[in-house]
A protein has these predicted regions:
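Cysteine-dependent hydrolase recognition
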Residues: 1-190
Length: 190
């Protein structure tokens, strides 16, 4: 695995709130179409994704996970569970984003159970290093262990953690023991 396909970046890539990266660019099949920030997902004609692997061994491990997921030996109610995590601050922007997505889903189907783990709905604990949300951390862990089809996060983050308070960290994710109940994980984050 030596060549990488670059991610499409919006033409105005220095705008703080409206810049984005998307592989949808590679799925637009009609000539003249361009990705726009307000464009409906209905105009995409092909599902596209990536296997985040840098070595053959990593790729094989990911393919094995996909095969296990496809064979679906642990079917159950967990597949109707959608978990929403929204960062605090920013005038509730992240909470509003999550609510808008949920509202759109509810117009298409009402068969989902929505578990909302919005930081603004929980009490913060103050420590010497800053705020933490232990109840959110615990609720996320419980949701992952019980099984959730989707874990959607909107807010600040990086490759090591989501939220300044680290409600999800890389080390926590590596400790998850949820084989057979892997969530689709979406992060709308910096």
């Amino acid at each position: 695995i030596k060549k990488e396909l670059p991610v499409y970046t919006s033409e105005v890539s220095n705008a703080i709130l409206t810049s984005y990266s998307s592989d949808d660019f590679y799925a637009i099949q009609q000539p003249g179409n361009q990705i726009q920030f307000t464009q409906s997902i209905d105009s995409i004609h092909l599902a596209i994704g990536r296997i985040p692997a840098r070595t053959i061994a990593e790729a094989n491990k990911m393919v094995e996970k996909l095969i296990q997921y496809q064979s679906n030996k642990k079917m159950g109610l967990w597949q109707n569970q959608l978990t929403w995590v929204a960062d605090d601050a920013d005038f509730n922007l992240h909470l509003q984003d999550a609510e808008e997505i949920i509202s759109n889903l509810k117009t298409k189907t009402a068969n989902w159970n929505h578990k909302k783990l919005y930081l603004d709905l929980f009490k913060a604990s103050q420590t010497l290093t800053g705020n933490t949300y232990p109840d959110v951390n615990k609720a996320i862990q419980e949701s992952i262990q019980a099984g959730t089809l989707l874990l959607n996060y909107t807010g600040h983050g990086n490759y090591l953690r989501l939220t300044e308070e680290a409600v999800i960290s890389k080390s926590e994710m590596q400790s998850w023991n949820n084989t057979g109940k892997l969530p689709i994980m979406v992060t709308a984050s910096c």
